[in-house]
Amino acid sequence: MVEGDTLTEAVLFDFNGVLVDDEPQHCDALQRVLADERITLTREQYYAQYLGLDDRTGFVLAFRNAQRTLTTELLKHLVTKKSQLYLELVRTSLRLVRGAPEFVREAGRQFRLGIVSGALRREIDHVLDLTDLGDSFEVIIAADDMSHSKPDPASYLAAHDAFNRRRPIAARACVVIEDSLPGLQAARAAGMPCVMLTTSHPARALEGRGAALVWDSLAGHSAAELAGL
């Protein structure tokens, strides 16, 4: 560390693809709901265009791409329908990202922890209830809390504000762990260093994007590696 550098004090985790390996379930649920509206979404399109977006933004994008009108009432219905389907899927196929439980427990002994996600709060709570990680997080920012989706930095800035209300912390002292390009853009715009996981994109697709580190997974890594970012 160079004198004057900020030491890491907190770690902010994205949720889907970082803590829980559920992007396939989100993709499946979105595909099914859109199919009922006669809109086709391929898996390739999901990972290229929709990964990292909250459900509201995703449906707006899908209807815009299909040149279809989406009313506020229909949008609300589709978000609820997709969330219900996701919860049904994840109940029978929940899988945490490799190394996530151990990493979170270790990180919690060294840093303040938070979740910043485009998922709905009830989805986050449901998954945390199925694990023993729920008490690890001081701050949780979900899609319900925000009007702007990543890559807008608002959700990461909201997490920083929430930390500050409890005990002051510099934004630069918050390290983000993400798996999506919009998430990386949001973290950088918030002034936070970002570690990228290759859960959803190959390492070569993340090169030159401004990530502080690129890891294949959380397994085999120590939270202490974040101390000097």
Spans of features found by a protein language model:
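Glycine-centered short loops/turns at secondary-structure junctions
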Residues: 110-111, 191
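Short, flexible loop segments at the rims of nucleotide/cofactor-binding pockets, characterized by
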Residues: 90-94, 118, 191-194
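Thiol/selenol-based redox catalytic cores and closely related redox-interacting motifs
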Residues: 114
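Conserved G/P- and acidic residue-centered "switch" motifs that form tight phosphate/ATP-binding loops
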Residues: 14, 18, 117, 179
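Asp-based, Mg2+/Mn2+-dependent phosphohydrolase catalytic module
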Residues: 1-9, 101, 105, 121, ...
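N-terminal helical cap/lid subdomain that shapes the substrate entry/recognition surface
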Residues: 5-101, 105, 109
